[in-house]
Every structure is written in structure tokens, then in C-alpha cells.
């Protein structure tokens, strides 16, 4: 596929009609079943050694899927000789792998684009690009182009595997390259990658989301559900085991929708995959993120059966009020959610449960917000990621008139966060005087005399003792705060 290009020196005012821009209406469509392509990557002959003696930097915003995309792009860039550089200012190539979930993330990206634009003006050989979920948004790409930033290339989430082809066009055609596919992509296997952690790694099990929550842009930026074949997933896990990995996290926009897009009659769903991954023998298995109304009890039963599946579930509810949930297009009854949590705790008593909550959805009343507080008290979550509703152009919720002032939304967020702090500390204190198995990361970032790692429940544990990165050691917990457990290593 030929990208749409334009001579960046030809005019100050760009003719946007010449670009193949993202189209939010097209992105909503679910056109065809995804193909699984095993040989969708090759190095363009013209740039096989182009990166030798050059460095690159990728700044990643957002979720685990973006982090995994970054690892894939790192792998491809290093195949042509590039070396990673921590310093943006001295790198020859910089990519911004962006997130579109909230306005704050977009603001930070545009600030970075401005910084990179200034570097480009002082060093014409410097190359920088914008990719990821923001690049899938019409308004964002239009803003970049109309602002006349000296960006070299823009591409989205569906053609990450083509980064070297796009770079080739930038190098030899000296033009701005824009290649954003609005329709969902295929499943491209056998891509190179450079994992950023040599103990714990992410494995994509599926891509995209078909839930269309009214506030969420992800179904448009990531496309429809596309599940990977179990054989490819298990091969990747086995490869990680052979390389010494201790922990794998299965990731997707909604992992427990895995397999629903397979051909009729192929009854292989997430609980089946989770069991097969556990059977590989890798020491720790995690997964994220789950949608509660697809979270079957068979998943809980599988977790109970295999001790190497870690007892932590991230289960976003977003609101404690059913009217708000209906407006969000999240058809979950609060009673059903409570029943699910009760089932989890009855079968996996040591399981930690975390959630996501949105405050100030358009026209949320004080009474509706109070129901979120009531649910939080009932569940006593281990932790929560809390946010003020962020309007996303192209979503259904974006056109709803909203009468709630921002000041009131901030007050509600503060009230909710105080509750989160209270129960996080209360739950952590339950581990005092207990012994936990901790996978060691290494010295704590804040105190090099202390070792840090994670418990099975996804709790940060700081402890004294002598342990090497990658070891799983027993730690007696002696104290707890909201964010961490503290203890000492025991024999």
C-alpha cells in the first residue's frame, strides 16, 4: 500500500485533501473477519543497514497494548541497526506512541510534538513520528497537519508492522508520510520485538473491542475483536520460558472476549486459553483487562485450579449506578457484579480485586455518585484507578449536554479518592504478619538498600534481605501502607 505523501517544503498551508486521513465513521464499521498473516513483515532492501551508527527513542503513553506495540517497533528498528537511546535530545529518530483515552494524555503529546518540532528545526536530519491511538483520530491528525509541525510520519495502530516501509519513504522521498488505516487490521504474527523486561512480559491474546461504551474511543482506535490462534500464543509463551521469563501477562482490550470471534463451533474461550497457558509451567500467569459482563465463573474456576495463575483480577465497573451504566452502554447489573465478586472471594479467598471508576459522567447526579461510594464500601476494592469523565470526540457521550460544573466533579473525585486510600490501606494491613511469595524485581527505585518485587496479589513488596532479580522468595510482612507492603526475607 502506497502511503499518502506530500512535499513538506512545498507550502506552508497544507492541502489536507491529499492525505489519507483517519475516518471515525469508517472506524466504527466491522467489515470482515480478520486474516492471520504469518509472513507480513520484511525489511525493505534500501534500508537494511540504515540505522547503523544511529539511535532511536520511543516515548510510550497509555496501556499495556501500547507498551507491547512499542516493543515490536523497537525490535524492527534494531534489525536495521538502530540502538536505543534514553535521551530524546540526542536521538536520531524519535517516535511518540500515543494514547487517546483521556484529554490529559493528548495534551502531553502535543507538548512533546512542539519540543520535537524545535529539535527538527535545528537539526534537519532528525526524524520524528507520531503513532498509536491518537493517530487514529481525525481531529488529532488534522490538528497536527494544520499546525505545520515538521513531523515526518504519522501512522496508526493497525499498521505497526509497516514502520520500516514508512521510514523508507521518509528517508528517500523527503516527504511527510501519513498512513492511517481506519478499518481494523489483520493479525500479524512472527513480528520481531525487543522486550523491555527480561523477567516479566506481555503477550497479546486479542486485539480490539466491540463493546462500544459510549465514553470510549478504543473501539474506533483499536478496531474490532481479533483473537490470536492459541497455537501462536502458546508458542510465544514457550519461547519466553526458554529465555528465562518468570511471569507472563495476557493482554487485550477485553481479554475475556477472547475466542468469541472464532468460527462457529470452535468453542475455545478465554478460560480454555488461560488453562493451557498455566499448563506451560511458567511460574506466574496474569491477565488484563477484563470486562465484568463477559467474566464467566469458569474463569474463576480455572484460576482456583492452577496455583501459577496469580490471584488478582482487574474488574472495571466504572459506576455504581445502573442508570449511569446504561448511559455508558455497559449492561451490568450491580447485583450481578456483587455476586461475581462474592463468587471470586468464596473460591479464591486471597484474591485481590481492583477496578476503574469514572466520576462526573454527563449529568451524573449526586445521588448517582453516592451509589458508586456505596458499591465501593460493599466491595472494599484493593485499589481503583479513578478519573473525571473525559470527553472524546467521535463517541456517543461526547454529544450529551453536561450541566455539572468541573469544580463539582473534582470534589467528587477527591471524595472517592479518600475512600480508595482508606480501603487500600485496610486491605494491605491484612497481610501484616503473613508470609508472601515475592518475585524479585531488584533494588527499590526509591531506596537502593531495599529490595522490591511483587506478591501474587499484585502488591508492591519492599523488603530487606539478600535476593537476586528473578528469584521468588518468601517475605514476612511487617508493616503496610496504602501503596506498599514492607517486610523481611525469611529462609
Curated annotation (Swiss-Prot):
Domain TRAM: 429-491
Ranges of residues in domain MTTase N-terminal: 54-172
Cofactor binding, per record: Binds 2 [4Fe-4S] clusters. One cluster is coordinated with 3 cysteines and an exchangeable S-adenosyl-L-methionine.
Alphabetical list of PROSITE patterns matching this protein: MTTASE_N, MTTASE_RADICAL, RADICAL_SAM, TRAM
Cofactor dependence: [4Fe-4S] cluster
PANTHER family the record matches: CDK5 REGULATORY SUBUNIT-ASSOCIATED PROTEIN 1, MITOCHONDRIAL TRNA METHYLTHIOTRANSFERASE CDK5RAP1
Protein name: tRNA-2-methylthio-N(6)-dimethylallyladenosine synthase
Annotated source species: Malacoplasma penetrans (strain HF-2) (Mycoplasma penetrans)
Gene: miaB
